Amino acid sequence: MKKLIFSLLAASALFVSFAFGKSVKNEETEEPEKTSNLIKNGDFSKGKKFWDMFLSNGSADQLVTENGEMEIRIKNPGPYEYAIQPYFDGFSLYKGGVYKYSFDVHSSIDRTFEWRLQVNGRDYHAYVGGWDSVGKETKHIEATFTMREPTDFSPRLVLNVGMGKGCPEDMKGHSIFFDNFDLELVDASGITEIVTSTTTSNVNLNQLGYLPSAKKIAVVRSKKSAKISGAFEVVDTKTENVVFSGKLKNAKFNGASGEQTAIADFSKFSAEGTYKIKAGKYGESFEFKIATNIYDGILKSAVRFFYLQRCGTKVQDADFGHPECHTTRAVVYGNVETSYDVNGGWHDAGDYGRYVVPAAKAACDLMLAYDHNKNAFASENILDEIKYELDWMLKMQIPGTGAVFHKVSCREFPGEVMPQDEKDRLVLCPVSTAATADFAAAMAMASRIFKDYEESAKYSSAAKKAWEYLEKTPFDGKGFTNPILFTTGAYNDSQDADERFWALAELYKTFGDEKYLELLKAYNPVEIGQDLGWQQVGLYGLYEYLSSDAPKDSFYQKAQKAFLSKANEKLKNVAMDSYDVSLSMYEYVWGSNMGVANNGMLFLLADKISPNKKYKEAAKCQIDYLLGKNTTSYCFVTGFGTLSPILPHHRPSQVAKKPMPGMLVGGPDSKLEDPFARANLSDAPYAACYIDSV
């Protein structure tokens, strides 16, 4: 179990594919009927709710006027029509359906614009659309069309109001106004498809299953107000025989998921086999196994995922293989005459950028996993995979100064293409102290982990060189921000104290030099020890310091208290939540599954510092949550479980039209930062804010 937590954590750190999965009904089918307006808030009576705007080298504000119109106040129209693109997500177009689409528009100047209902991805082609001229008089646009293509459950309404064909060549600042959007299915007779909603369960558990000796808990839920009561049965799926039964316990309302819950505890049952839970009127669970090898497949897939993400080399795989990619030299931002070979490393998340900050976290998580359970990775070549990333990171360090470039990427995210088809110029974005400190920490750890290999010496030298740069370079008060016109991931940070602390802790643990220890003691452990994320890394530093040969003095005691306090804080969340997840109600944010995996790792590390059975059990609970014991009913790792995401935000998966297995997706985001999620989940409880859509 421990090895799996570390592996999933590493995957979540670098490769959280921020799919937003749908929390939906149980086995319902419905045929689409004639509808009222499919565009929510099409009259802007609720302000900008459900509406958003994409900018690409254009500049504009999206407002709602006192008259209830959407105003796009254009400052710079950009170089092309989609430089400014207001849009709406959250409707479906069914094959064979006849639709009527209309809206009103006027502008403060004479110009043209493009309107489209389009595919939200791939080649972004339009199902229906057109170019129209507009001026100060309000114009009514209306079109009736038949959806000829396969049903699209997540298209996008777009308005391209940048510099398009027919616009004045000297077009400058102005406003264009929209109102009264209406999309109706006026004739459903041609629709032959039956629309099936995702099948979820009211009995949720780890969909892979359990080790025979493990604690085994399923959560039974109900949206009704009455408390849950009754009994449950464990049923052998081969024989349909009841092999274990018990009473539902701990009935209560769970605030984060907004539902009544109770637990079915079948921990005493340990016979290997394939089973499901039946809970009377509440329904039954998905199938699961009890076996000694249930995690072997997912561990292998999670580790292989890193191989499939390799950049700069031929990757062999029937579905996701590709030739060499991104092999050209990268120019330095602001100094294009200078270039470096930065070939290698892993592609990040859904795009093909390579970023030092999350790379350091992912590499260190894998090294921690290996260090804590070497035998588990004997057949996985895990050190070779880690080395592939570390050797790329070495190329990101400037030889003369020891400073480290923050990232290498193209200026913009690519379309839905395989990595070899991203042909834009590679650019090394400016050095950052956060990236340099993370680099120093990773290299110092690598020097220790690879101590029996010749690579150890170069990792050691790189770590020390990076720290020398940091000693000469105080934090600039701002941190890294994307250069102008760059839209790829920023991985920014408003301070670097935790990164420096982590670097010092790793340097001290690896080399034992007292100078690192003295510098480390200048920091406040309470302020430093906040998280194991890519932005807040202080808990890594505290753990490495506490597990070093440092004297057990007053600073050590303070650091230990701070570290365990954070673990105990998360432990309280586990005790309060029906699903035993370590998140508070308000921590279901962008990438929440990374938080769950981070906390699982924190529990294991805390157990190393202060052994406690509760830490180990809590760590196992986080795995159960990620693999299906949650209110969405999803196993959040692609390719595993009965219900898992099929539409992750991951370009190779989008090209292949199937999810790459072994990815941990981002999970619920109660802030609804994805427009499609916002349009469909506006009333969903915190823990249910997940929809499986790119």
Region spans (language model):
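Low-complexity, Pro/Ser/Thr- and charge-rich linker/hinge segments at domain boundaries
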Residues: 188-204, 213, 285-320
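Short coil/linker segments at helix-helix boundaries
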Residues: 368-388, 421-427, 445-459
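Carboxylate/His-rich catalytic cores and anion/metal-binding grooves
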Residues: 380-403
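Aromatic (Trp/Tyr) and acidic
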Residues: 207-281, 304, 308-364, 368-369, ...
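Structural beta-strand segments of beta-rich domains
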Residues: 99, 201, 214-218
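Short Trp-Ser/Thr-centered turn/loop motifs at beta-strand boundaries
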Residues: 88, 129, 282-288
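Bacterial Sec-dependent N-terminal signal peptides
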Residues: 1-25
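Extracellular and organelle-lumenal recognition/adhesion modules and their flexible linkers in secreted
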Residues: 22-192
